[in-house]
Amino acid sequence: MAKGRKVINNHWVFDVKPDGCKCTHLVVKGFSQVEGIDFDQVFSPVVQFETVCLMLALASIGNWHIEGLDVRSTYLYGKLDEEIYMKQPKGFAVKGQEHKVLHLKYGLYGLKQAGLAWWETLNKSMKDLGFECLKSDASIFLYKRKGTTTVVAIVYIDDALFCGPDIKTIKEIKAAFMKHWECRDLGPAKEFLHMNIQ
């Protein structure tokens, strides 16, 4: 471990989702991170609520298809640039090596920079898939074929909507997206950011 580095503690969070699914998350106690040592930047863009409303209104006017998906464990995909060390999680410490620590390479929930690391990874992946990021809202991505926007992707942390006039193209794009991340395909979107979609 590098000199001057602090070891961050962690804890388990147990949760029951609205659908009854039981989840467990390992959460880093990021409040103990030191700015300038453990992280520099923490801001990560999220889609503006007004932009979501506008995009859904345009989709409604154009009679577009709207498909949803949920990216599982999003922050675990964000590659870290900083050196972060964490204590071994309770119940997973290696017997006889409890004094050793883990060097984190990817984000975990609770890290100050986890959201930014995920967004940077997502942004690069979307560009690799052929999307362009909207300049006015960094969580709206446009996919064009023959100069015409064919799919609009709206991403809010781990939730995404894919909207467009052609369901076949949307499904192709969704399938390509899901090759990059472990996702739960929600099919035709019924809800996004607590808004009902009909």
Positions of the model-derived regions?
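Long, low-complexity, charge-biased intrinsically disordered regions
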Residues: 1-198
